[in-house]
Amino acid sequence: ALPVVDKDGKYLSLLHYSGFAKGVLTILNPEKRHAISTNIDLIQKTLNAQPIIVSNDSDKNFNATILVGSSSDETFIKRLESHASEDIVVIASDREQIHKICIEHKVKLMITTSGCVISKELRELAEQNGVSVIVSPYPTSPTSMLIAYSMPVSVMGDKEIQTVSMNDTVNKIQKILKDAYCKYLPVVDEENRVIGIVSEH
C-alpha cells in the first residue's frame, strides 16, 4: 500500500492493490461503458506515444470515453454521435477514413496504432478542428489495455481508508485494523502529513 499525498506531503488517499485491481478490472470490463479520468500527457507517457498534434491543455484531467475505431464507417459514426457530448478518445489503426471521421467529429484525442502516422492533409484538418493526435507503437489491443493505466494515482487512491495519529496507541490501532478491509493504515502528524504506514502484519 502507498499513501497518496499532495505537494505539501498531506494525506489524500491510500493506493492499495485490491482497490487498484478492482478499478482497472472495472474499466476493462467490455460489458460496461466507463469513462476514465486522465489527461493527454498521461496517455502519451503511458503508451510511449509519439505526439503529432497536442493541445495546450494536454495536462488537464478530463473524463475520457474510450472508443475503438474497428467497426464499419456507418456504425462508427453512429457510435461517435451517441457520445457527442463527451470527451472522446478514439483508438484507430491505419484506416484513413476512420481518421477523417474522427477529426471531422472533433474528438478530444485520436490515437493511431502500430506506428501509423496520418497524412499531411489530415494533420492540417486536425489542427483546424482542435483534435490532438498521438501515435502508439503498439497494436490496437495492447493500446486499449494500457490506457487504463494512464489514470493518475489520485483517482485510483481509496479515500475511505481511515488515518491514525502518530500518538495513537497500539491497542486503538489494533481495533481499527481488525475491522478494516485494507490491512494498512496511513500514520499522520498534527498537520495531516504522512509519516508512515502501519500494517496488521
Task: Outline where the language-model segments fall.
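Bateman/CBS regulatory modules and CBS-like beta-alpha motifs in cytosolic regions of diverse proteins
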Residues: 1-6, 11, 41-52, 63-77, ...
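Internal alpha/beta core interface subdomains
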Residues: 20-28, 105, 116-120
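Non-catalytic interaction/Regulatory regions outside core domains
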Residues: 67-71, 97-104, 108, 112-116, ...
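Long, charge-dense
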Residues: 123, 129-157
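Short loop/turn microsegments at loop-to-beta-strand junctions
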Residues: 182-183
